[in-house]
Design a protein with these regions (language model features):
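Hydrophobic alpha-helical and helix-loop surface patches within well-folded domains
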Residues: 1-151, 155-157, 278, 285-305, ...
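Long, ordered, helix-rich scaffold segments
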Residues: 12, 28-31, 37, 66, ...
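Intrinsic disorder/low-complexity segments enriched in polar/charged and small flexible residues
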Residues: 21-24, 130, 166, 239, ...
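Residues that act as N-cap/strand-start positions at coil-to-secondary-structure junctions
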Residues: 131-133, 162, 180-184
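Preference for bulky hydrophobic residues occupying beta-strand positions
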Residues: 139, 168-170
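Short coil-to-beta strand junction motifs in C2/discoidin
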Residues: 160-166
């Protein structure tokens, strides 16, 4: 299943590289990071003694984490060598049965005999397959040396003594090299201690990176635009998870995000938006105007760049990005003009582009009143398309009203809502910025 996940993205990326599928994969694997950051996580592979054990394997750790470590290995040894190793594995075991180690041994055989750098593939992969969790790579300069060290990353910031064999791409200035971190620390001589240093260059590693303050400042300054999309995505994702783990303050994170006012990539904005949505749930009432001003300042340059209306010939991902930043501006930035334009889109059909219509739907719901709620409910009951019906249903969970969220929770358990849709509707109610706890209590009280 992990290999199938890897091939799903590899094949599509080879067919349509402009879709940036490996960047999308970087976003998708975040779910595996989240689960693997808990002490209750599990190893990717474990003995299966019952059907229940087998069922337990069908999760993000098998699919996303498993696919991610295959991608990490492929990028470290090189796609051609990886492909040759898989080919050797298939030919060697044609019409036979195999175990996991057979794949690692086949790849290791190729990289040990083709004249290239020798990599201990089985030992490397065993440290990821048979150990739960993943490492945080700390990066600092000590004198004339770059120091990389590892410890387990957990949300409660209480790592155990687990060590991994970590394949790392390090870019120092304009030169990228590969290092294998096999112990708790490795030191790399530097010819220029003032160079910009990027660890997890190109972003294939299944680990988080923690830079010292001076090294982070070098990256988030004028050189930020020189990072590729996945590198910038990982930079934000790692910083946000440092906040979740209590290793970075929310104030420091907001200051960090100010360097992204010129960001124009969907994937990076998706992690920024997710973090801002989470922050909005804990912002004190008296600080909400300041938070809204910050969001508006952060988003406005992108709104000005992309505009409100689609442009003929623009990239497919631009429409999704426009919808995302419109929601940020209108909901979290509390921009009244953006809210008005969203109402025009939804009620007057001033724009029919699907991503903007979807964004306008969420904005009107999040900023709407009881009259708007009745309109959404009516459209759900009499939709023009099945897609519109689902959009209207989920919008019922966005309203900023305890009474309306209570109605939505009750509505989820009626015969008007399909049983396969009810859990997703309740999940969205729980995710409501102001009334999530109310929805959670409803679920607890009605759990059977």
């Amino acid at each position: 299943e992990a290999f199938a996940t890897f091939m799903e993205y590899a094949a599509c990326d080879a067919f349509m590289p402009q879709w940036q599928l490996w960047t999308t994969f970087g976003l998708d694997r975040s779910a595996a990071f989240d689960v693997d950051s808990l002490h209750s996580t599990r190893t990717i592979e474990f003995p299966v003694n019952s059907p229940a054990d087998a069922d337990g394997m069908f999760d993000v750790l098998t699919y996303q984490k498993g696919g991610a470590i295959l991608r990490m290995l492929e990028q470290y040894i090189g796609p051609d060598r990886f492909r040759a190793g898989v080919s050797h594995y298939l030919k060697t075991h044609a019409y036979g049965n195999t175990e996991t180690n057979d794949l690692w041994d086949a790849i290791e055989h190729v990289v040990s005999t083709d004249g290239g750098p020798i990599v201990p593939v089985r030992r490397l992969m065993d440290s990821w397959i048979w150990q739960a969790g993943y490492p945080l790579i700390s990066v600092r300069i000590d004198g004339s040396e770059l120091v990389l060290s590892q410890r387990q990353f957990t949300f409660d910031n209480s790592p155990d003594a687990t060590l991994w064999v970590v394949p790392i791409h390090v870019r120092i200035g304009d030169t990228t090299s590969k290092v294998l971190l096999e112990t708790d620390e490795i030191r790399i001589p530097l010819s220029d201690t003032s160079a910009t240093i990027v660890v997890n260059a190109n972003g294939p590693g299944f680990y988080r990176v923690e830079y010292s303050a001076d090294l982070l400042l070098r990256i988030t300054g004028s050189t930020l635009s020189s990072l590729d999309t996945l590198e910038r995505y990982n930079l934000v994702d790692d910083a946000w998870n440092a906040v979740v783990a209590g290793a970075m303050s929310s104030d420091a994170y907001i200051a960090f995000l100010q360097g992204f006012t010129n960001e124009r990539d969907l994937a990076v904005w998706q992690i920024i938006a997710a973090s801002l949505k989470s922050l909005s749930r804990i912002v004190p009432t008296e600080s909400e105007p300041d938070f809204a001003t910050f969001v508006k300042t952060l988003v406005s340059p992108s709104i000005a760049h992309f505009g409100w209306k689609p442009i003929a010939g623009e990239e497919d991902l631009t429409a999704k990005l426009r919808g995302l930043i419109v929601q940020l501006l209108a909901i979290h930035g509390k921009d009244t003009d953006a809210q008005r334009q969203c109402r025009d889109i939804l009620f007057n059909n001033t724009v029919t582009e699907p991503e903007l219509v979807a964004a306008a739907t969420n904005v009107v719901a999040a900023t709407g009143d009881a009259t708007d709620y009745e309109w959404f409910l009516g459209r759900y009951r009499d939709p023009s398309t099945p897609q519109e019906q689902i959009r209207m249903l989920y919008a019922l969970a966005e309203f900023d009203s305890a009474e309306l969220i209570a109605r939505t929770c009750d509505f989820a358990l009626t015969s008007e809502v399909k049983t396969q849709n009810a859990p997703f509707l309740l999940n969205r109610c729980i995710a409501n910025r102001k009334h999530g706890e109310q929805a959670w209590n409803f679920v607890r009280q009605n759990w059977q």
